[in-house]
Amino acid sequence: MIITVTMLVSLAPQPTGAATYEFEGPYAIRVLHQGLELEFSGTLSWAVPQQFGIALAEAPNVRIVRLNSPGGHIKAAVEVADIIHARHLDTYVPQTCASACTIAFLAGNRRIVSASAKLGFHQAHGPGLSSEQSNVLLEVAYQRFSLSSAFIAHVLRIPPWDLWTPDLAELRKVGIVTEVAPDGAFAASVP
């Protein structure tokens, strides 16, 4: 099963009641390796949680979620994290998981990265919420997965246009990463 969206246009209500068009980046969801892995790549848009849930319902033997994402909408990431957490799935990052993607990654039972993977953190921002509201959601999500208040405070000092990518030693020390796999330890992204 492959779900690919190249461009999604949605009408998103804003707090003022006005509506604006919002263009969301492309994403793909694929079930791999005889149904044992689900790969998500691209932007965490509003449509992702529903499609993610459908893909998992059709592939009940999935044990690991492979993430490769620059981020996206924080609420979409929280919904994906809820699904991952409820199914007790592991998460794996072969390359990059940044911004809102880190919330989905933290939901993994085992949180595995390749030796060359990068996890990126910064303040939340996005349409429909103030910066303060977005950062409260981010803080609550990170607290849910037991990140220290010192780590969260550091993330909240990184402006939304910047990205902090702690090294693997730091990520292991604070409990974000539970395992580091050598590059190529997991099969390549092929069905």
What residues fall within each predicted segment?
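Bacterial N-terminal signal peptides
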Residues: 1-12
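STAS-typified acidic loop motif
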Residues: 18-19, 23-51
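Terminal peptide-recognition signature
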Residues: 40, 65, 105, 171
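Soluble non-cytosolic domains of exported or imported proteins
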Residues: 42-50, 71-78, 95, 99, ...
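Extracytoplasmic/secreted envelope proteins and their assembly/folding machinery
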Residues: 49-56, 77-81, 85, 102, ...
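Short, glycine-/small-residue-enriched flexible loop/hinge segments at domain edges that mediate gating
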Residues: 59-76, 90-96
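Glycine-rich beta-to-alpha active-site loop
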Residues: 85, 89-126
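Charged, glycine-interspersed solvent-exposed loop segments at helix/strand-loop junctions
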Residues: 123-191
